[in-house]
Structures are given as structure tokens and as C-alpha cells.
């Protein structure tokens, strides 16, 4: 009995000491710097923004890319990296968010961005001279708390100042990796606090002399691999033809890392030249998989009504009938357990810290 009392007394003393420590931390670092997971203040539902691809939203498990996190999108040349990020920018702008594009490659096509649905008049753009400048601008924008999405295109183009000012043949090993490591250490906390989504586009390089495993690696060292909550590997797997003309690419995205849902899921979609991700094509494919759209031979039907012979015609039908496309999409989302988009009011998404 006495032992029990002693144990209870010790527990009470610990509780008192913990309360004093928590009070001291809050006084020193501000309210919310530490809290219990059971308290209502902790965000349980992750706020997301759609990728513009229904299949990829589903593969990510939470309905899109998580806000307040670092995301890396990498792949070979002409695989659709910039197209995918511009689609995310367009989706964020639809929610009323403010977006910035750090164009380190100096290669952003404004007309193409506009065709993908980006409001280029409202898009903030920077074309920095050095990697340090690009990351300082990113840091300043994140700290402002008024930016919802920042895209850095690309990590490979974040050239350290010492390399730009040096001679062409100078060997400066690990300089870019150190720059990225320092920047991400500084950025991560602020990104979470301001609920800003930061997307790094990255390129692929080949490791020399690799006998086993993949010889592919991404540029900029290992820091980004650790700090990224989501890593997407995007690949072009085929061409889409209309007659003899190639009108787009068949694309595969693999969720290589995911801290907010199970990883290693894959999404397949079409990127049409000049139009971006074919959402109607995805709705058809996923609708067939979920048995919401019937496919008989080359014909596609919905609710017993034929919507087109061949995928091109069915895609065109859904483009001309957006209400039916939305209805099928909502049924697909319900069947796969993903919440419908825009279920959170825009004002709430933008103002929440």
C-alpha cells in the first residue's frame, strides 16, 4: 500500500516538473512550440493541394501533395517534371494561393505555363544568378508567411557562387551538396510553421562503376533525400499518336518516398503537348478500373450511355461534358477512398498557418 502511495506521489511530482518545464519552454520559445498530440491544436488532417493528376493524387494516399513540407520531383530530361509542377501551381492558384517560381535554369516558357492553367500575371518569378541567391530568395519568401507554394527549377542549376566566379576547370567537390544541406537545415522549420509547400525539381546523373543496384542518382548530395517528405520519380514510358503524329507522352510516376502515407505506389497518365496532363483520359482509365465506366471492345459507356469509340473520342466527350466528368471523378474518388477536391474552402486553406 505504502509503495503504491510512493509511486503515486512520484508520478505527481513528475507531472509538476513536466508542467513547469512546458511552461518555461512556452515562455521562452512562444505558445505552440511544444504540445501534446492529444490536444486539439495539433493538426491531424494534412492539408494538401492536388497535383492536377487524379491517379497521382490517389497514389499519394492523401489526395495530393502535403502543405508545409518539402517535395522532390526528379526524372530524366523531357519526362514532364516542369509540366507536373506547373499543374500543381495552377491547382494552388485555383484555391486562391500565392505561388512563386525560382527559375534557376532560366528556361520557363510563360506561354506554355499559361496553357496549363497558370495565372502568369499573379505568378512570382525569380531568375537568380547563383545558388546562394536562389536559396536566400526562397528563405525570404517562406519567412514572409504569405506564400503558399514555391517551385525551385532545378537543384542541378543551383550553382554555388565560388563555382561561377572560379575558372572553368576548377575542382570544387561537395560544394553544391554543402549548400543544399545548409539551406534545408535553415528552411525546414520555417516551411512547416508557415504551411508553405516547397517543390524542388531535380535531374538524374549516372554513378560510374556501379556493378549492383541502380547507377542513377540525383544531384545536390543526400540532404534533399532526407528532408523531403515526398519524392516522385517521373518517367516517359511511351508516345501517344493520332494517326502518324505524336501528340503526347505516356507517363509513369512512382512515389519513391512518402512520409504521409504508404510509399511505392505508381500512377500512369498522359501528358498531351500544349495541354498538360489529360485529366479526362485519367478519369476514363480509372473509371474502367473501378468498374464505373464500362468498356466493350473499343466503346466506352457510362450509365448505359455510350460516350465514345476509342479513348480519344471518349476523352473529347468528357471535355465537352464537364459535369459528367466530375460525376465520374467523384465516384472514382469515393471508390478509392480519396476525398473530393475543393472539400476545404479556399479561404481556410490560404489563411491557416
Curated annotation (Swiss-Prot):
Pfam families: RecA, RecA_C
Keyword Calcium: no
SUPFAM superfamilies reported in the protein's UniProt record: P-loop containing nucleoside triphosphate hydrolases (SSF52540), RecA protein, C-terminal domain (SSF54752)
GO cellular component: cytosol
Record bears the keyword Signal: no
Subcellular location: Cytoplasm
Residues forming coiled coils: none
Keywords linked to the UniProt accession: ATP-binding, Cytoplasm, DNA damage, DNA recombination, DNA repair, DNA-binding, Nucleotide-binding, SOS response
GO molecular function, one term: single-stranded DNA binding
Binding site for ATP: 75-82
InterPro entries listed in its UniProt record: AAA+_ATPase, DNA_recomb/repair_RecA, DNA_recomb/repair_RecA_CS, P-loop_NTPase, RecA-like_C, RecA-like_N, RecA_ATP-bd, RecA_C_sf
One GO-annotated biological process of the protein: DNA recombination
Primary role: Can catalyze the hydrolysis of ATP in the presence of single-stranded DNA, the ATP-dependent uptake of single-stranded DNA by duplex DNA, and the ATP-dependent hybridization of homologous single-stranded DNAs. It interacts with LexA causing its activation and leading to its autocatalytic cleavage.
Similarity annotation: Belongs to the RecA family.
Name of the molecule in the record: Protein RecA
